[in-house]
Regions:
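Short, polar/charged alpha-helical segment
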Residues: 25, 32-57, 63, 67
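Short helix-initiation/N-cap motifs at beta->coil->alpha
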Residues: 55-66, 159-188
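Pocket-flanking alpha-helical
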Residues: 61-92, 203-207
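Alpha-to-beta junction loops
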Residues: 69-79, 129, 174-177, 191-198
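Ligand-binding "clamshell"
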Residues: 86-98, 111-117, 190-192, 197, ...
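A conserved helix-loop-strand patch within extracytoplasmic ligand-binding domains
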Residues: 94, 98-153, 255
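A bilobed periplasmic-binding-protein/Venus flytrap-type ligand-binding module shared by bacterial periplasmic
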Residues: 105-118, 226-244
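Periplasmic-binding protein-like
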Residues: 139-148, 249-270
Length: 273
């Protein structure tokens, strides 16, 4: 009888994680319509396990961390480490990184110049050039690095983390004017500028082909700054449901949809672990 009781208890304990994960709704904050396609395979798989994931769309990068910190979300997945570190420190949010996900490219696009060499030639000729960049600190810094690598501007080397506009130096003869706008609006200024540096999530949301970029960002997965992440409140870092959400997303179901719909936009961290 004692042996039966022990076996019964062991069976109950084995079922506890499954019961804990069942019938829960996880509100997940994102920025951009493409996340609906990106997350759908994981959402479907999680639903089979009794975990309902509800995507909550935000129109601006400044909102999802505030919503997560305030309890309006359980999880968010929209930002890279550089943004997360700056935003949580600046605003005193009590958030933690649950898992790394991918690097989403930030590329240089132009509606006027089919190649970066043609844009470089205009800069070298001393003609006025207007380039649109994001206006938030971390995405702007990343955009400036893209422009430097593309040969459109130069930068001083006395910055920490990512540069800002004070670090911008004109290349010889250059007259490049930078126009900072909300990151979500960079694509909308493409037709009215010489070029624009556009976050991949917004480019994907507008159906932009990443191959149409006149310069593609040099992606380094050993550099944590621009690796995107899934975040939770610090108190929830060990929550098995949220850990399971991250685990399923970081799996073959997402790899497949990236290959089918978003090839060229994402570099998946779990492919290199």
């Amino acid at each position: 009888m004692k042996k039966i009781a022990i076996l019964a208890l062991a069976l109950v304990l084995a079922l506890v994680p499954t019961l804990t994960l069942a019938d829960e709704t996880v509100r997940l904050g994102v920025t951009g319509a493409f996340y609906e396609d990106l997350w759908q395979p994981a959402i479907d798989k999680l639903a089979e396990e009794g975990i309902k994931v509800e995507l909550v769309q935000f129109s601006d990068f400044s909102l999802p961390n505030n919503a997560l910190n305030g309890g309006e979300l359980e999880v968010n997945a929209f930002q890279h480490h550089a943004y997360f570190n700056n935003d949580t420190t600046t605003n005193g949010y009590d958030l933690q990184v649950l898992a790394d996900t991918f690097v989403i490219t930030m590329n240089l696009y132009s509606a006027k110049y089919p190649t970066v060499e043609e844009l470089q030639a205009k800069v070298a000729a001393g003609e006025a050039v207007n380039v649109v960049i994001p206006n938030d600190a971390t995405n702007q810094g990343r955009a400036l690095l893209v422009l430097k690598d593309a040969g459109i501007i130069d930068l001083t080397d006395d910055y920490e983390g990512t540069p800002n506009t004070e670090n911008v130096v004109q290349v010889e003869g250059g007259k490049v004017e930078l126009t900072p706008v909300n990151a979500a609006q960079t694509y909308q200024f493409l037709e009215d500028s010489d070029a624009a540096v556009i976050n991949g999530n917004y480019a994907a949301s507008y159906g932009v082909d990443p191959a149409s970029a006149i310069f593609q960002e040099n992606v380094d997965l050993s550099d944590e700054r621009f690796i995107c992440l899934i975040a939770v409140r610090t108190a929830d870092i060990d929550n098995p449901t949220y850990q399971r959400v991250a685990e399923v997303f970081r799996s073959d179901v997402t790899t497949q949809v990236v290959k089918e719909k978003f090839d060229g936009f994402f570099y998946l961290t779990w492919d290199n672990e």
